UniProtKB/Swiss-Prot annotation:
GO terms for molecular function: 4 iron, 4 sulfur cluster binding; ATP binding; ATP-dependent FeS chaperone activity; iron-sulfur cluster binding; metal ion binding. Heterotetramer of 2 nubp1 and 2 nubp2 chains. This is Cytosolic Fe-S cluster assembly factor nubp1-A. Binds 4 [4Fe-4S] clusters per heterotetramer. Contains two stable clusters in the N-termini of nubp1 and two labile, bridging clusters between subunits of the nubp1-nubp2 heterotetramer. The gene is nubp1-A. Component of the cytosolic iron-sulfur (Fe/S) protein assembly (CIA) machinery. Required for maturation of extramitochondrial Fe-S proteins. The nubp1-nubp2 heterotetramer forms a Fe-S scaffold complex, mediating the de novo assembly of an Fe-S cluster and its transfer to target apoproteins.
Length: 315
């Protein structure tokens, strides 16, 4: 994983790159000779700093998806809301989807800014026990595009993990971008020493989504990231009047259930399609408090309980 010094030029290739200290972007950089010698490619000292910072966080959960648009950030937001309903639990939500930060909108925090304190960056609070951090809080407008190369993304993730003053936290949920990219490698590398409970992988029933989830599962196994389980999102539509279920996205190859059986992965549950979930995300409100008795809410609660049970067993 390429890292980038704080005082590096904009297009720094990263200290682990074969071009470190040699590319045209390195001209004039104060670190050029160090990078060219290979001395900068050693273990990142930030790993130990992050390990110490994360010692105050009991459980760390990554939320992954193979493909965009399957409801990964929606799940992350509602996992945080669901866990925070227990007022005795301190919950933190970290958005590392650097180029597509949707968590501020979903949590009703659009327009909020990061504040610096003596102990680091202060997260933004939704409730007294629910804190959020996102690159979206660093943008002057939610419409601003983040056009960064991998090393700069890695530097931002490192800063989030090392410099945000979460305090004592029971659950840290990390919402990642879709796929398997620099951001995922960064989070896994930096948090592995601190102990990650595991990953929750989000999919929809169609094979076009499942084929990318299989890649995500292989990624987790290669980097030795435990898999808590898979959630099948948009799994049928339950009519609010007649209560009959219709398959909007038919599971042509058996859906997440068959895939989990084939790959020996736990299926945490299925969340039915509910337009009110999207409405809650658009308005920045918790679906649990807006529609507490809907089939989707009940499914979410069962899934969250299974995640909690898994984390408690790992203690």
């Amino acid at each position: 994983m390429a890292d980038i010094p704080d005082n590096a030029p904009q297009h720094c290739p990263g200290t682990d790159s074969t071009e470190a200290g040699k590319s045209s972007a390195c001209q004039g950089c104060p670190n050029q000779s160090i990078c060219a010698s290979g001395a900068a490619a050693g273990p990142d000292p930030a790993i130990e700093e992050i390990k110490e910072k994360m010692s105050l966080v009991k459980h760390k959960i990554l939320v992954l998806s193979g493909k965009g648009g399957v409801g990964k950030s929606t799940f992350s937001a509602h996992l945080a809301h669901g866990l925070a309903q227990d007022e005795g639990k301190e919950v933190a939500l970290l958005d590392v989807d650097i180029c597509g930060p949707s968590i501020p909108k979903m949590m009703g925090l659009e327009g909020e800014q990061v504040h610096q304190s003596g102990s680091g960056w202060s997260p933004v609070y939704v409730e007294d026990n629910l804190a959020v951090m996102s690159v979206g809080f660093l943008l002057s407008s939610p419409d601003d595009a983040v056009i960064w190369r991998g090393p700069k993304k890695n530097g931002m993730i490192k800063q989030f993990l090392r410099d945000v003053d979460w305090g004592d936290v029971d659950y840290l949920i990390v919402d990642t971008p879709p796929g398997t990219s620099d951001e995922h490698l960064s989070v896994v590398q930096y948090l592995s020493a601190a102990g990650i409970d595991g990953a929750v992988i989000i999919t929809t029933p169609q094979e076009v989504s499942l084929q990318d989830v299989r890649k995500e599962i292989n990624f987790c196994r290669k980097v030795k990231l435990p898999i808590i389980g898979v959630v099948e999102n948009m799994s049928g539509f339950i009519c609010p009047k007649c209560k009959n279920e219709s398959q909007i996205f038919p599971p042509t190859t058996g859906g997440a259930e068959k895939m989990c059986t084939d790959l020996s992965v736990s299926l945490l549950g299925k969340v039915p399609l509910d337009p009110n979930i999207g409405k809650s995300c658009d308005t920045g409100k918790s679906f649990f408090t807006e529609i507490p008795d809907s089939p989707a809410t009940l499914s979410y609660r069962k899934i969250i309980q299974r995640i909690q049970d898994y984390c408690e067993k790992k203690k």
